[in-house]
Amino acid sequence: MFRLDELAARLGGDVVGDPATTVRRVATLEQAGEGDLSFLANPKYVGRLKSSHASAIIVADSARSLLGEKAGIVTRDPYLYFARVAQLFNPPEAVAPGVHPLADVAVAVPASVAVAAGASIGAGVELGEDVVIGAGSSIGAGVRIGAGTRLAPRVVIYPGCVIGTNCLIHAGAVIGSDGFGFAREKSGAWVKIPQVGRVVIGDDVEIGANTTIDRGALDDTVIGNGVKIDNQIQIGHNVRIGDYTAIAGCVGIAGSTQIGARCMIGGQAGIIGHLTIADDVVISAGTLVTKSIHKPGVYTANLPVQPHADWVKNFAHLRHLDSLAARIRALEQSPDHPESA
């Protein structure tokens, strides 16, 4: 439980109303009640603010007057402020250090490390202070994991990979499996190319459940600092992702693509291999990227939803674009066309 003036002292912001107002959790404007702290980040929800029963509301300076008699905190970015308050109210679960008797650990680990039942830690592994290894996780030989990193149950880290400090890797993620590398014989048979690179992950990275990041063929696959990767994402071998890029669920990134810093990639986007994407690029959900992107900006290549009957009619026209274009060119070249006179 915090008073508003205590929150402002920790996180900044201007308190409106009674600074001794206490809040015990964060909640949406609709669901908030006595003792709850809510926030208004989007002006279209002003109506919900007016009817909210929250004890206090976080708002931008432009919405200060909307608080009326309600208590609140005024800040430049209400959504970011809400995120920081939510961290205060919901700290990571405390985990007792120690190695479970049913864990298979081949190395000495710091006393502050927690290794759960069924986990396996191979030879030559280096774990930093306060690392947590979840139940059933497998850490291959020679892996290095930085201080404060947490692995949920059943995470697999293949041999030789490097994980930075204060990372969070969710259940079922696989780091360092073989990249998809094969050479083809004249007969059509495939010859596997050994994947001898590593996966190197920076600090403060979060990797979602059931995401797979392939090890490099020769060079490493590299994930920069502060990168946020959602669930069920496939990252191919030799990919390099710049600092603070965020990638939403079900994205596929083919091998040897380089993605810049601070990019945002929407869900189910696909990026083919050997491309370069500049810093500060936003790729809309469902977009297929087939060419390199050299300038910052928002890029979209998909069709918005529409009634099926309309889609069928529009697609019928799409199938005949070549003939329609030829007819237009013929009309433009006709002696009867106004511009040909």
From Swiss-Prot:
SUPFAM superfamilies for the chain: Trimeric LpxA-like enzymes (SSF51161)
Name under which the protein is recorded: UDP-3-O-acylglucosamine N-acyltransferase
Protein family per UniProt: Belongs to the transferase hexapeptide repeat family. LpxD subfamily.
One GO MF term: N-acyltransferase activity
Pathway in which the depicted protein is active: Bacterial outer membrane biogenesis; LPS lipid A biosynthesis
Enzyme Commission code: 2.3.1.191
Active-site residue list: 237 (proton acceptor)
Group of enzyme by EC: transferase
